[in-house]
Curated annotation (Swiss-Prot):
Name this protein carries in UniProt: Large ribosomal subunit protein bL33c
GO molecular function: structural constituent of ribosome
Naturally occurring in which organism (per UniProt): Platanus occidentalis (Sycamore)
Lineage: Eukaryota, Viridiplantae, Streptophyta, Embryophyta, Tracheophyta
Listed GO CC annotations: chloroplast; ribonucleoprotein complex; ribosome
PANTHER family: 50S RIBOSOMAL PROTEIN L33, CHLOROPLASTIC, LARGE RIBOSOMAL SUBUNIT PROTEIN BL33C
Length: 66
């Protein structure tokens, strides 16, 4: 039987550079990826290097709250 909360949860990763540049309106949008993480293995915030189509390069995408 499953206890309480699920071990695997869906997380949203957002480009850190697009968020910073969004204030200056240099970027036309914000890149977001949806993925899963295991709560037991990675209890802290997830950060991955992914390709951002708005920055045209690989940048750090950090986990955001839903």
């Amino acid at each position: 039987m499953a206890k309480g909360k699920d071990v695997r949860v869906r997380v949203i990763l957002e480009c850190i550079n697009c968020v910073r540049n969004g204030v200056n309106k240099e970027s036309p949008g914000v890149s977001r990826y949806i993925t899963q993480k295991n709560r037991h293995n990675t209890p802290s915030r997830l950060e991955l290097r992914k390709f951002c189509p708005y920055c045209f390069k690989h940048t750090i995408h950090g986990e955001i709250k839903k």
